[in-house]
Amino acid sequence: MFASRFDPSQLTAPAASAPEGIVGTTPPAIVPLKRQATESDNEEYGSHQDSDESSNSSSEEDEDRMQVDYGASEEDSSEVEEEESKPSTHSTVLSRFKQTVSLQERLGASDIAESKEDESIEDEAASTHQLKQIPQPEFVKNPMNLNTNSLQFKSTGWLNTEKIYYDNSLIKPFSDYANELEAKLLQNICKNFSTNTFPIQSIILDSILPVLNFTLNVSKRNFTRRIGDILVNAATGSGKTLAYSIPIVQTLFKRQINRLRCIIIVPTKLLINQVYTTLTKLTQGTSLIVSIAKLENSLKDEHKKLSNLEPDILITTPGRLVDHLNMKSINLKNLKFLIIDEADRLLNQSFQGWCPKLMSHLKTDKLDTLPGNVIKMIFSATLTTNTEKLNGLNLYKPKLFLKQTDKLYQLPNKLNEFNINIPTAKSIYKPLILLYSICQFMAHSPIAAKILIFVKSNESSIRLSKLLQLICESRSQSSVLKNLQNLAVSINSVNSNNSKAENKKIVANFSHPSESAGITILITTDIMSRGIDINDITQVINYDPPMSSQQYVHRVGRTARANELGSAYNLLVGRGERTFFDDLNKDLDRDGKSVQPLELDFTLLESDSELYTSSLESLKNYHNNTAQA
């Protein structure tokens, strides 16, 4: 802690050897005021041991004096440092030496030990420890619907909406709404549809009807702002069409003059017909006018019809809507409802820039240009979560209706799913395995089957349908197809090679087969996976796996509709397709169910192999003849 003692004799030799005339050319080294005692001081330090022992009895007083002396020594040292800038002298060095000696005499060994103990105590007191989180108030949230794998990362477009949850227990009779619905409307619902609601219908009617009826009685002008916009994410076949149709008809039921007050936008012509049928049944016995606009009709004739007789409700596709807006066939001045069905598909495709065009006309045509002047209802089984696309709709106080689950998409409650794993070595016989699987279905199903098969492309649909027809024509020669030998099998394909009339006829025959039909099979692409309401589809088969969980939801949603039983079968070839399907399952809610593996005892005999080979050869000849023709 203190400097070693200084010997003046050591400086005489260098000073004597210095040349004459030069004084203090080399500045002396600055010796610190306090240094730790070196081993050379041990002998002299021992001579003062007696005085140190006496100082131990009054250590506190010595410490006070030491602090005073230490302060004085610091002042002296500052003076010494100022003098060191001048030529050094022996007297300066000796005075510093004496100061050091006097301090060492006053400071005993026990004081040094105590100072070290104090330093160690201070070190212990200043030791670091693990950081602890400051207590925070509990965050109020819904644990059933805040899963980090789904909503936090995939549903950013819904973060600013009011969420309203429902579950499968929300089923009630429509008669409970007798005080909220017009008597004629309630009669049409119970007569043409059902006496009980579906869960999504219950939650929407409970949330909208009381506010809607109260606001209409007070002020019809501002009722749209009291309701706000609505986003609905519900499984296919859950009754979404009826859910948005009932509030519309209830609002327009007592209108005096027909004006365009509702536009319903759907992606396909087939869905136009389906929605039109629903609204026609709901509006029976009323003066409401429901019209459609689609590509099959002449644009000129539609323009003339809409100009002469303005409808209350218009059902159309986005492209045809843009055509009529450009031709000024319709005016949005009195529009109160805008319904977008299958919204994820419509918002993912431009369709002549229909969304910006429509929003622009809403601003220019309507006298009331403030937000919330139109109630927008957005429906889909796989509602988009893209913030940019939802922002283009200019939503006003949106409410999100979704099922109480931690998954992104919901499957029908009464859907049963099965996986048929096909080894890679047997993938060449996949069409034959498909027919064999259908044989197994029929062995446990005494009723007629209506089977919808999805493939990846239009060409696959054409080839597979023809190949299955050729195999079934000679199925009596096969051992694996023995269950099909006594049944009538009808196989058709919906594809772009057919005319619109042919495809329409094929779909109609599939929807309403004859009483003698045993198995009716329709092979199609994803064009029929959305919005097509065909009753009594018993099985859906994914011959080619879907590309996303959205496609899977829409495909299997063609069965198990309206709370009826249905089955879905997935043909998976090799480990790669099985792994891909497992990834799709992460976004799907099955209400506690799981996909069951279906083991098939597929033993291929020589006769089956010969039948399959001959069918492939016949298919090749058929395509060659078709190409030449």
Swiss-Prot record:
Primary gene name: DBP6
Stretches with biased composition (Polar residues): 88-103
Modified positions (Phosphoserine) in chain numbering: S73, S77, S78
Gene Ontology cellular-component annotations: nucleolus
Protein keywords: ATP-binding, Helicase, Hydrolase, Nucleotide-binding, Nucleus, Phosphoprotein, Ribosome biogenesis, RNA-binding, rRNA processing
EC number: 3.6.4.13
Single Gene Ontology MF annotation: RNA helicase activity
Annotated function: ATP-binding RNA helicase involved in the biogenesis of 60S ribosomal subunits and is required for the normal formation of 25S and 5.8S rRNAs.
Protein name in the entry: ATP-dependent RNA helicase DBP6
GO biological process, one term: rRNA processing
Region (Disordered): 1-130
Localization, UniProt: Nucleus, Nucleolus
Lineage: Eukaryota, Fungi, Dikarya, Ascomycota, Saccharomycotina
Motif DEAD box in this chain: 341-344
Domain Helicase C-terminal per the UniProt entry, residue ranges: 437-603
Family as reported in the entry's similarity comment: Belongs to the DEAD box helicase family. DDX51/DBP6 subfamily.
